[in-house]
Amino acid sequence: MNSIVSTVRGILTLSRSETFDSPRDEAKSDLKVLSVAWNQVCSGFIVGTNHGFNVYSCKPMIKKSISRAPHESGFKVAEMLFLSNLFAFVGNGYNNSEYPPNKVFVWDDYRNCCLSELTFKSEVIAVKLAREHVVVVLKQNIYVYTFNNLKVDRVIETLMNPKGLCCVTHVESKAVLACPGFHPGQVQVHDLRWNVIKFIKAHDSAIACMTLTLDGSLLATASTKGTLIRIFNAVDGTLLQEFRRGVERAEIYNVAISSNLKWVAASSEKGTLHVFRLRPDILSFDPASSSSFIRVILPKYLYENERSFAQFSLPASTKFIVGFGSENTVLLVGIDGSFRRCKFDHADGGQMVELEHKYFFSLQETGNTMVGGV
């Protein structure tokens, strides 16, 4: 069985040899990172280890205490709902058979209890939490539960999905879910309230990662080829913008869209974080307008495949997930136990400046202030 690193919109799979020991802390020399995931707005992240899970806030970068959640078992999947008291986790099955890899535990840390145990016939690959739903991803099925009663709302079929790719919206006004379709390169977008499904042919090769904006209006995707990142209107499937990460194949770990809809970031195995600029009129873009006429006249390379606006170099040997912080800042969490905060020039771009670099296992635990907030 593999260990995994979970991004906020998908999963990166690690072999057991790729799990990372806790650095710079001899007292915790046996602690290993099994999974890392942002919360829904990148204001915090959760780390699954071989001894329970840890929760961290990004504003500022501090460790939060968890009252009675299990600490003697390994969790290959750990997810949090904003900075609330609600969590979901899946055991890796190595340390303790009480937490097998085919069972999801929904934990309320305020009540110090497990709200529900969701058991499946096969291994759970990923879990996603939203205000209204708990989403459980298996290799070829996705189970959507209503959060208030934890009953199955629907089951979605996909092609083989070993990375557990899935993303959901996190605003009260919409309930949208995106996941792989039935063919390589295809994405299916579900409006969970109106039972509307849209299939988008995003790439020729298989999907490597995807993300939705908080309101479900935009969808960003990258394929296993790893050269292009595409932005779609999630409602009608229109291709709105295309970015080029590079010309060589690469594994893209995850993609993030800033909350102000100005920037897109991507991390990959090449060791460079790329930030791209979204078109200012991205949501009002009409492919039938005069710009489409320009697209016909100009060579394709002048209109599409826009290069990155800002960059930051990272250790190529470490997998990172990326998210956006405050204005013009990017947050990075690595499976080596590192946290970075970087800033880019919104006018000129270029090389980013590192503002903060810490190892989160070395942080002291603070009081339990998880209830409420984002």
Swiss-Prot record:
It comes from the Eukaryota. WD repeats lie at residues 28-66, 72-117, 202-242, 247-286. Disulfide bonds: none annotated. SUPFAM superfamilies: WD40 repeat-like. It is found in: Preautophagosomal structure membrane; Vacuole membrane. This is Autophagy-related protein 18e. SMART domains: WD40. It comes from Arabidopsis thaliana. One of its GO terms (cellular component) is phagophore assembly site membrane. One of its GO terms (biological process) is protein transport. Component of the PI(3,5)P2 regulatory complex at least composed of ATG18, SAC/FIG4, FAB1 and VAC14. It is a peripheral membrane protein.
